[in-house]
């Protein structure tokens, strides 16, 4: 009898763990998602899609037949032209991508805004000020060590930061007729390390793209040293310093934090709100201007 009582109690405990909860999830109201990064060396363009709910099984689809008005300093320049391209997705299904183009390059210092309307969605608006390119000065390139086919270099460069809030992206490109990409580099520069979210002393930034602000050197000449390794290949190496808008800087940082958060177990990390400057929608309208310097490696 005693054993039967224990068995009955344990059976009830396990049975009570199987609970089905019906969640009353409100239907997701789709909004326009706009992604557009203006660069002074390319014509104005944007991709437009729509949002999906967290529990929505449907895929993200690009939106066609939208009216996209482009303004420069508040003056209407005209409407974007819609272009469609077809490709096959990972399920071997024919998919279409709609891109909106405007045949004009943006100008540094100008404010560009979009007003976008579509009969199925709430109208959205966004604007960005295109930053001016900052001249890059390479002070020296030093060969630190050489072993077999590997060479360790250090490049020291500088630029003059304007006395206002500025945001930068640093990349190091390699290329020849067969290869084209961005090389990893490392630096112990405090601005890069702080902007990457690392606060510990003695830390080193490592990656192929550094985003940083001018909080530590506003309005002064800034000098940075980076280390990198090259191998015995006939490649050209170019240092690339890009002035980016605050909207682009904030969006990319929040997007990285969102992706990093996905690597954790469910509910283990704090949710990350991805930045947007699209009124009544999602996505980003950002801008940038770039200066480059071809390196002569000793």
What are these regions (language model features)?
Residues 2-7:
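Sec-dependent signal peptide recognition
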Residues 13-16:
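C-terminal motif of bacterial Sec signal peptides marking the signal peptidase cleavage site
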Residues 18-298:
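A sequence/structural signal for flexible, mid-protein segments enriched
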